Design a protein with these regions (language model features):
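Conserved Lys-Pro-Asp/Glu-containing loop-to-beta segment of HAD-superfamily phosphomonoesterases
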Residues: 23, 122-146
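Acidic, Mg2+-coordinating phosphoryl-transfer loop and its flanking beta/alpha structural elements
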Residues: 136-164
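Alpha-helical substrate-recognition element adjacent to the catalytic core
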Residues: 2-119
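Surface-exposed amphipathic alpha-helices with a cationic face
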Residues: 70-74, 130, 153
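Alpha-helical elements of Rossmann-like donor-binding domains used by nucleotide-donor carbohydrate transfer enzymes
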Residues: 68-69, 125, 151
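Short, surface-exposed basic-aromatic patches at helix termini and helix-loop junctions that form
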Residues: 95-102, 131, 152-160
Length: 164
């Protein structure tokens, strides 16, 4: 049944465009658009990840296929959000520009929010971003974490979640 509902939503996206209902695409960065740096997803060593998370190392991460889909979505006029649990870095927008990743808004982990879980943080940030549209939007959320996907699916109306 869930697949049928998703197919109906996909077919209705063209109809949404004719009514000027915004289509929002929200993407995680690590493991979704680009290969993650370091081994955090395997060893959950946050201090090691912070040490590995340098501008130089990020320049050489391998692009994943969804990055090209993001570019196509932006060309179609969709609203693009990048939502990452990475600690705030001044150079992250520059990195996205160098990697040719267009976006409308970015959310990184604020330094003061280090202790909140990733799935709760992403849900809060996404709610903040979509709240300006009220109930008039179509949201696609892309993430490689089942926990993040479940949190968004259960906590945000009108979200179509894509686990990659």
């Amino acid at each position: 049944m869930k697949k049928d509902k998703m197919m109906i939503r996909i077919q209705n996206k063209n109809l949404l465009k004719s009514f000027d209902i915004p289509i929002i695409k929200a993407y995680d960065f690590d493991g979704t658009l680009f290969e993650p740096i370091g081994t955090y997803e395997k060893d959950y060593n946050l201090e090691k990840f912070k040490k590995d998370n340098t501008f130089f190392k990020n320049l050489f991460t391998e692009e994943l296929p969804l990055a090209e889909e993001l570019r196509k979505a932006k060309k179609r006029g969709n609203i693009i959000y990048i939502i990452t649990a990475r600690e705030w870095k001044w150079w992250f927008p520059l990195l996205l520009w160098l990697k040719n990743i267009p976006y409308d808004e970015i959310r990184q982990r604020p330094k003061a929010r280090e202790n909140i879980s990733t799935h709760k943080l992403k849900k809060e940030q996404l709610i903040e971003l979509i709240s300006k549209y009220g109930n008039s939007y179509e949201l696609d959320f892309y993430d490689d974490s089942s926990l993040n996907c479940n949190e968004i699916e259960q906590g945000i109306k009108y979200a179509v979640v894509h686990k990659v």
